[in-house]
């Protein structure tokens, strides 16, 4: 069965009056390395603006989880072969992103240490990326045409997936701050998480398929000494400025 990524976007629709001077829907790209706080900030920004939220990283993590499970029964299966065996769905509603594989809720499972260690390898496979990127672009076009803004977070949204996005951010922080945030999520020691993050950074920035990089026209935000609320305010202000032009 060919893998079909289905993204359901429900919840309150945004309107021009819902966030001040907003006069048109926008595509917002939020890129950055692992542990920079992209997911937290994206969720808060989506709630603040009423925009739809597409967690692209969750899609790749879902493929990774499925691949790791497949290998338990089929040790020699390739990543591409695994991808086409499963139906992945990602839905957004009231600030929560739910991820399912063949109907099973794997929202928590995809944040495991094992998935984190393997996701760079899986997301670098051309067949996997082609499936995900095709859906991301199509979904954004549909939402914008309906008058609703869209927020996408990932590592190459502004540079590869949506190079024409009108608002682009690159969120970063020093490794120790990122490790502390991720450690709170996983319960791991910070020293252990730093090693994983540094390995992930190297893999993401040097891979052949769409490596991690800042888009030339992206606004870089260093969140090392900023709270999530402060980052959201900076982004929200920029969105209002662009939307009112």
What function would you assign to each model-found segment?
Residues 47-112:
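N-terminal phosphate/diphosphate-binding loop that engages ATP/GTP or pyrophosphate donors
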Residues 30:
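Hydrophobic anchor at the beta1->P-loop junction of P-loop NTPases
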Residues 18-21, 101, 105-107, 177-180, ...:
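NTP-dependent small-molecule kinase module
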Residues 107-185:
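ATP-dependent NMP and nucleoside kinases share a basic, alpha-helical "lid"
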Residues 41:
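Hydrophobic positions on the alpha1 helix immediately C-terminal to the Walker A/P-loop
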Residues 38:
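Conserved lysine of the Walker
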Residues 91-93, 136, 140-144, 155-160, ...:
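Small-molecule kinase domains that catalyze NTP-dependent phosphoryl transfer to phosphate-bearing small molecules
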Residues 33:
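P-loop (Walker A) phosphate-binding loop of NTP-binding proteins
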């Amino acid at each position: 069965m060919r893998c079909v990524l289905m993204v359901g976007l429900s919840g309150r629709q945004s309107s021009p009056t819902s966030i001040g001077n907003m006069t048109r829907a926008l595509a917002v790209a939020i890129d950055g390395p692992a542990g920079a706080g992209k997911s937290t900030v994206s969720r808060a920004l989506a709630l603040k603006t009423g925009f739809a939220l597409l967690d692209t990283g969750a899609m790749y993590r879902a493929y990774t989880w499925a691949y790791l499970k497949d290998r338990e029964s089929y040790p020699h299966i390739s990543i591409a072969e695994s991808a086409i065996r499963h139906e992945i769905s990602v839905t957004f509603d009231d600030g929560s992103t739910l991820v399912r594989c063949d109907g099973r809720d794997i929202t928590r499972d995809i944040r495991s240490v094992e998935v984190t260690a393997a996701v760079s390898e899986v997301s670098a496979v051309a067949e996997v990326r082609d499936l995900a990127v095709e859906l991301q672009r199509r979904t954004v076009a549909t939402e914008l045409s309906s008058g609703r803004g869209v927020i996408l977070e990932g590592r190459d949204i502004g540079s590869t997936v949506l190079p024409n996005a009108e608002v682009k951010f690159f969120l970063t922080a020093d490794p120790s701050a990122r490790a502390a945030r991720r450690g709170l999520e996983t319960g791991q020691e910070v020293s252990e998480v730093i090693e994983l993050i540094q390995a992930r950074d190297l893999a993401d920035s040097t891979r052949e398929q769409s490596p991690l990089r800042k888009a030339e026209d992206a606004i870089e935000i260093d969140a090392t000494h900023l709270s999530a609320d402060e980052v959201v305010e900076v982004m929200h202000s920029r969105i209002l400025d662009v939307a009112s032009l």
